[in-house]
A protein has these predicted regions:
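Cytosolic nucleotide-utilizing catalytic cores of signal-transduction proteins
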Residues: 1-163
Length: 163
C-alpha cells in the first residue's frame, strides 16, 4: 500500500548498449519525466507514476524543441483566455478542464475524480465554455485544446516562473 501524501514520479529512457550511450538514455528519461503529468496515468492504487520514453508517441515531437514557449503561438485563443483568467478560479477551471478531457468528456467521472458534486462539475464546464468559446462537440477543437494544455504543462515544467 502506498502513502497517499507521497507522490512518486519518474521518467525512463530506452535501454542502451554500453556506458558510452548512457547520456542519450538519460536525456530521454528527462524528456519522459517532462510528460509524466501530462501523458502518464496515475495508477488506481496511488502508486508511482512512470512515463517511458518509448511510450511518448507523438509527444516525442515536442521534445525536439529547446524552448517549449515557442509553441505558444499554436495554443488555441480560448485556452489562452483561460490561462489569463484571475488566479484562484483559473486553477480550478484548468484542473476541471484537464479532468474532463482525461475522462473523455464524461461529467460524472470528472466530478468523481475531482471529489466535487456533479452540478459543480457541470457549472465549471459551462463556465469554461462561456469564457473560452471551446466547442466540446468539435473533435479537432478538443484535440487542439488538449495539445495546448500539454504545451502549457511543458512550459510550466521547463520554467516554473512562467505562469
Amino acid at each position: 500500500r502506498y502513502n497517499k501524501y507521497l507522490k512518486i514520479k519518474a521518467g525512463a529512457g530506452r535501454v542502451v548498449d554500453g556506458i558510452i550511450n548512457l547520456p542519450e538514455s538519460f536525456k530521454e528519461a528527462n524528456e519522459a519525466f517532462m510528460f509524466v503529468d501530462v501523458a502518464g496515468e496515475t495508477p488506481e492504487d496511488g502508486g508511482p507514476q512512470i512515463m517511458l520514453f518509448a511510450d511518448l508517441g507523438i509527444f516525442k515531437l515536442l521534445c525536439q524543441l529547446s524552448d517549449p514557449s515557442m509553441l505558444l503561438e499554436y495554443v488555441p485563443e480560448g485556452l489562452q483566455k483561460l490561462y489569463n483568467y484571475k488566479k484562484p478560479q483559473r486553477d480550478d477551471l484548468i484542473t476541471t478542464l484537464r479532468a474532463y478531457l482525461d475522462r473523455n468528456l464524461n461529467l460524472s467521472k470528472t466530478a468523481q475524480d475531482l471529489y466535487v458534486h456533479y452540478k459543480t462539475a457541470v457549472y465549471r464546464i459551462e463556465k469554461i465554455e462561456k469564457l473560452t468559446g471551446i466547442d466540446f462537440d468539435n473533435a479537432n477543437e478538443v484535440l487542439a485544446v488538449r495539445i495546448g494544455l500539454v504545451v502549457y504543462k511543458m512550459i510550466e515544467n521547463y520554467n516554473k516562473d512562467f505562469i
